[in-house]
């Protein structure tokens, strides 16, 4: 606002994606795509990984892709509040209310019903309800392949120094990165252990049972660590292909989707916000053509599958 962006706490420590011999070909394919698009990503073989990150156990690794520039992490809540403040300054009206129904007339949604009893007439409805997107779709008498999936993050401390640690993605699905004076870590569960879920209960055995052994294997200094806390949240998980659903729903003239980001939401939110705004104002995308992410792929069952998911 007033020419100044929000303070996001960007830490440019890089992303390091690791691959064993079985994943080397796929990593190289993805690396080629990134380089074709001008991304400055380094390919590090086993010796280069060991030289650059001497605290890393590379015995079972073949290669790594390291983005040292323009990659890292931010404070997502600061980004959210920055979006909100800017929207309010431009005239947006935020209501803290629970939606309980959508009034329909033919191929249009004509009003939104709130738990308070208020009814808001509307020209267009944008479903951006995150992990509850499916519930909103049901109110419109339709469906979305988006379900709430719980994810857990654990914070831990390590007395040993781990210099220049990036965000590390392990072939096992484990990830970890520095956070404050310590670290945070997590991993996605196996599909059979990943039910639809909206509670915030912690699995207090997750760290010692699953995460700690993998951490200690990849970073020997993590043999001596201590869990400090953690939290849970929910992915808006697109069960079709784990990618966003954007644009108009086929069943309605005025229902727009911005759903199913499956963990990519913070990264993609600036581009998606612009794209949906263009769609509402001009009737089509202008900056980026995101039609391939439309609802038609659900109707036609044509998933757009990401081949390297973390």
Protein language model features and the residues they cover:
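Short beta-strand to alpha-helix junction loop
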Residues: 17-26, 66-85, 200-207
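A short coil-to-beta-strand element that immediately follows conserved catalytic motifs
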Residues: 10-12, 94-95, 145-151, 220-232, ...
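Active-site lid/adjacent beta-loop-alpha segment flanking the redox-cofactor pocket in flavoenzymes
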Residues: 143, 157-257
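Central helical "cap/lid" subdomain
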Residues: 116-165, 287
